[in-house]
Amino acid sequence: MKHILCYGDSNTHGYIPSGGRYDDDTRYTGILAKLLGSDYRIIEEGLNSRTSSFDDPFEPYKNGMDCLVPCLDSHKPLDLTILMLGSNDMKVYFSPSVEKIAGSLAKVCQTILMVSEAPVLLVSPIYLGDNMADSDFAASFPPSSIAISHELGGALEEVARQLDIPFLDAAKVTLPSKEDSLHSVSYT
């Protein structure tokens, strides 16, 4: 049996923009499990508000690097880690930039490669929606964050190329919800 760890934020967790959590079969991890079949075990490690490596002053314990190594160790042996972080790194109080976020995610990928000794699939986050100003998250994600979300995919594709790992741009396969402009619409 192959073991795949999905390490991410609220979009991995399955956060529903109107509140709650998508059921197992609706979250991307559940869809992946169904598509791959019984020879694969999908391990879901999605945490709302998780950052790649930044300490959130309003939501402590969300720094993705802090729990990464224990998480990898607890799920060994792994055949693949799917890493989808970066959305929360765009919060205004982190003084975000494409370079800063890409650099942070490069370090996360390097840590995964070193600790798990298994491949990493780096997934760029979805775009932040154009109606973010009307969202409950508007104070954390100003227009500059929306611009970063549209540039991040290219920078992360370059990170993946440099690390010789596969890459997927989630913004090319799903959209932000109209409800909050941050979380993905249902994957089904």
Segments (PLM) and residue ranges:
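Serine-esterase "nucleophile elbow" of acetyl-processing enzymes
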Residues: 1-60, 70-77, 81, 155, ...
